[in-house]
Swiss-Prot record:
It is an enzyme of class 3 (hydrolase). It is found in: Secreted. This is Feruloyl esterase A. The keyword Signal does not apply. The keyword Hydrolase applies. Belongs to the AB hydrolase superfamily. FaeA family. It catalyses: feruloyl-polysaccharide + H2O = ferulate + polysaccharide. GO terms for biological process: xylan catabolic process. GO terms for cellular component: extracellular region. It comes from Talaromyces stipitatus (strain ATCC 10500 / CBS 375.48 / QM 6759 / NRRL 1006).
Length: 49
């Protein structure tokens, strides 16, 4: 299926945004795992619920 013009641009931007968000969640998960391993309370900005 071929998309053209603006819709293709929009699709590419959405994919890029999703990739960035996914990477951010992965970084956060790694940060939380390291915090748990270290036994520290960690940064309040990343506090668990």
């Amino acid at each position: 299926a071929s998309t053209q013009g603006i819709s293709e641009d929009l699709y590419n931007r959405l994919v890029e945004m999703a990739t960035i968000i996914q990477a951010a969640y992965a970084d956060l998960a790694i940060y939380n795992a390291q915090t748990d391993i270290n036994g520290a309370s960690g940064n309040q900005a990343f506090a668990s619920y």
